[in-house]
Amino acid sequence: MKYLFLINPAAGKGKYQPEIADAVRKYFDGKNEDFEIVFTSCAGDAEQRARGIAETGERVRIFAAGGEGTVYEAANGIRGFDNAELGVIPCGTANDFLKYFGDAEPFRNIEAQVNGKAFYIDLIDAGGRLCLNGCSVGMDAMVARDMNLFKRLPAVSGSMAYKLAVLRNFFTPRLGVELSVSVDGGELKKGRWLFAVIANAPYYGGGYKGAPTAVPNDGILDFTCVEAIPHLRVPKFLSRYKRGEFSELSYCSQLRCSRMRFVSERAVPVNRDGEISEETEMSFSLCRDALRFVVPAGAALPDAFKENANIKKF
C-alpha cells in the first residue's frame, strides 16, 4: 500500500505542518514502505492530487492534513475509487467530524494512523459535492462565511474569528432566512428559519452538537431545523444547542431522513463542510458506504459505530 500525505501549509496559519512532515519522515525512516509528502499549493490541489493517485488503481491510504476544506477536497477527489482510503490529521480549523471519535490525539499520531483500520462511512451528496460531516443553511452558514474572512487577519485566532462572525450576524434587524424545506420528497414547508442542518455526524461549527444522534455509518442522515426566534432568546438557545440539549424546544424540529431540499427566493449562504457558496436551492442526499475512513489505532469507537462497522469493515 502507498501512503500519501496531503499537507495544507495554510491551514491553522501553518503552525503544525512542519512537525507533521517531520513526524512522517521519522516514522518511515528505515522502513520498506512507499510514502509521499505533498504540500498543497492552492485551492483544489488536494482534490486533484487525491484523484490523480486514486486513478492509478494502486491501493492507497491518503491522509489529509489540514482543516475541513482539505478533507472536503480529498474526499471528493477519491469519489468512486474503491482502492483509496482517507485519513485525517487535524491541523486546521474545526475538524468537527473527528469529535465523534473522542480524543483527537490518536489522529495526530502517525504510527497510529498508519496502523489504523479503514471503515466504510456514509457521505452527504450536497448539490453534487460530497461532505463527510454536515451541511447547513441560514445564520450558521453566514457565521461560517464571515469566520473565513476574519481568520485571515494576522492577529485573529480561530476562536476569535468565530466570535467576531457571530457578533456581526447577531446585530441585524431580523434574524434568519426565508426558506421552503422538503424532507424525503415531501411537500415544501415554507417558513423563516434561524438555520437548517443536515448532518452525518454530531458536531459542526466548532463544537456545536447540532445532531446529537447522528452516526456516520448508520445509513441515515439527521436533520435539524430551527425557527427564527427573537434576538434576546438566541444566547440562551445557542448555549443549549452547543450541548445538544434542545430536543424539547418547541421551535426546534429534529428528524432522520435520507433526502432534504431547500428553495429560497434569494441566494443564501450554504455551508458544505466549511466550504461556503451562495445558492437559491440545493438538494442533499445520503450516499451509503461511500468512503473508507481511517480510524487510527487507539481512537475510541462509539458503540453505535461499532454495531454498524461489523457489517462493512474493510
PLM regions with names:
Residues L6, K31, T40, G80-L194:
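Catalytic core of DAGKc-family lipid kinases
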Residues M1-I62, A300, K306-F314:
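ATP/NTP phosphate-donor binding region
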Residues P9, A65-G67, C91:
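Glycine-rich beta-strand-to-loop/alpha-helix junction loops that act as flexible
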Residues V183-G185, K190, V215, C225-F314:
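ATP/nucleoside-binding phosphotransfer catalytic cores, i.e., glycine-rich phosphate-binding loops
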Residues T70-N83:
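Short Gly/Thr/Asp-enriched flexible loops that form oxyanion-binding sites at enzyme active sites
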Residues F63-A65, Y72:
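Active-site-proximal cofactor/substrate-binding loop regions of enzyme domains
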